[in-house]
């Protein structure tokens, strides 16, 4: 009876992980996070005006804040730099000299 290696499931596992990642990426890219305005037939997420014989909708759209917005990559860079600076200062503050007690004992 010859010995056979166990089945290798790495390729199907990689395919499942890549497929799941792509599905999550597409889901996040196609998601609408704008506020809902209007009714079930007329949607004005970016602002605008709609008028017909029975209804009139006027919506100004989402407003920008007065705080200047930085791109997401800038926030990530700022966060990484802040963490590195915090680690650097924490290492400076806890700098201790370690000595081997057994090496520096005097035999008398």
Swiss-Prot record:
Residue ranges, Cytoplasmic side: 1-8, 93-108
GO annotation, cellular component aspect: host cell endoplasmic reticulum membrane; membrane
Keywords, in A-Z order: Host endoplasmic reticulum, Host membrane, Membrane, Transmembrane, Transmembrane helix, Transport, Viral movement protein
Pfam family, one: Plant_vir_prot
Source superkingdom: Viruses
GO BP terms, alphabetized: transport of virus in host, cell to cell
InterPro entries: Plant_vir_prot
UniProt keyword annotation of Membrane present: yes
Location(s) in or outside the cell: Host endoplasmic reticulum membrane
Coiled coil: none
TM helices/strands, residue ranges: 9-29, 72-92
Lumenal side: 30-71
Task performed by this protein: Plays a role in viral cell-to-cell propagation, by facilitating genome transport to neighboring plant cells through plasmosdesmata,.
Note: TGBp1, TGBp2 and TGBp3 seem to act together for cell-to-cell propagation. TGBp1 is the main movement protein that physically cross the plasmodesma with the viral genome. TGBp2 and TGBp3 would facilitate TGBp1 function.
Family: Belongs to the Tymovirales TGBp2 protein family.
Protein name per UniProt: Movement protein TGB2
Organism per entry: Lily virus X
